[in-house]
A protein has these predicted regions:
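DNA major-groove recognition helix of helix-turn-helix
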Residues: 123, 134
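Catalytic-site neighborhood detector that most strongly recognizes the C-terminal catalytic loop/helix
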Residues: 126
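Motif-centric detector for short Cys/His coordination patterns
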Residues: 1-112, 116, 129, 133, ...
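Short beta-strands and strand-loop turn motifs
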Residues: 118-120
Length: 155
């Protein structure tokens, strides 16, 4: 996700990060070095060195800080980002389990009832078009119990 613009709002004590879909807020308290009243932000800009996927801010003292868009999305609990993070974690676990499994890959593919191409897409962590359901099926074939725990958010 690319950042279109970034600004700082001292009244809200937060950065305002605008993407193509919406605007996100990131409080100063979530970045390091943290801007303070006596050491405010001199300038903030979308960083082209990060492929416009992050921004850099410079404090009046000369210290710099860089923030990636993933930090902003994680703080704002963006549903798309959280889904992709869950898929990534499940994919990495599936890759480890496939390597450690005594089953041949052809047998795993047969038990999944899918093609070899689809199987390798499931194991590709860059592929975000797969579903959690498909990964859970793969983990089940690999004799894994997956427990989904839902709990109240801690303060």
């Amino acid at each position: 996700m690319k950042i279109r613009s970034v600004s700082h709002n001292n009244r809200k004590k937060a950065f305002e990060v605008r993407t193509s879909t919406r605007t996100f807020l990131l409080p100063y308290a979530k970045v390091s070095p943290e801007p303070m009243r006596d050491n405010g932000i001199a300038r903030v800009f979308v960083d082209p060195e990060l492929g416009r996927e992050g921004f850099t801010y410079v404090l009046e003292s000369g210290k710099e800080g860089t923030v990636h868009i993933e930090q902003v999305l994680e703080y704002n609990q963006d549903p798309g980002f959280l889904r992709d993070a869950l898929l990534y974690k499940l994919t990495i676990e599936a890759q480890k389990r496939v390597e450690a499994s005594p089953l041949a890959k052809r047998e795993i593919i047969r038990r999944l009832g899918t093609s070899a191409t689809q199987f390798y897409r499931l194991l590709d962590q860059k592929n975000s078009r797969k579903s959690v359901d498909q990964l859970l099926s793969l983990l089940h074939v690999l004799d894994c119990d997956v427990a989904l725990v839902v709990r109240a958010k801690s303060a």
